[in-house]
Amino acid sequence: MTERRIPYSEIFYSIQGEGRYCGAPTVWLRLFGCNLNCDGFMQDDLDVPESWSLDYKDADLSNVKAMGDLPVFQRGCDSSYSWAKRFRHLAPKETAGIIAGRLRDLLPGRAFRHPTSAQDAHLAFTGGEPLMQQPAIMAVLDALRDSGDAPNRITVETNGTRPLSKAFADYLKRMLEESGKEW
C-alpha cells in the first residue's frame, strides 16, 4: 500500500507571536486547503466587493516554479497561496515521515527539546484550514512519536468552521491521556 502524500504550502521555523505559546520557538506546517475565501482583508471599501484588488488572482505566475517564488500578497487572505486552486500545483506533497523529518531538521539539535536549555519547541499546524486534513495531522504526529521525538506543545490554528472528526477527537484524547495533560 502506498503511503498517503500530504499537500502543504510551507514548513518553517520562527517564534510564535500570539496565543498561549507566544515567545516559544515554533516549527510550522502550513497545510494546503481551506473552506473559506477571505478576499476582504486589507481592502479599501469592504462594502464594495467589485472594487477589491485580489493580488493572488492577478499575480503573474509565468516565472513561479515553487511556493517560495510567489510574491507577498498585500490584499485578500494573507495565506491565499495555501488554498487557492491556482497554486495547488506548487504545493509539495510528501509522506508524513518525510514531513516529520523536515520539521525536525529546522529545530536546534533536530529535536523538540533543545539539547542545551531543555526548552520545549512548539509545533503549529496552520493553513488554509488544517482541520480539512485531520488524518494528515494524526499521521505527522504519529511519525514524530515513532521517531522518539513527539512535541509536548501543539497548536492547530483553525478558522473554527470545521468540527473535529470522531477519529481525530479520539486520537487527541488518547494523546492527552498518555501524556497526563488535560484538555
PLM regions and their residue ranges:
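Conserved Radical SAM active-site core
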Residues: I6, L36, G40-E177
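Histidine/lysine/aspartate-rich catalytic loop segments that bind and position anionic ligands
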Residues: E177-W183
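N-terminal cysteine/histidine-rich coordination modules
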Residues: M1-G23, V27-C34, D39-L54
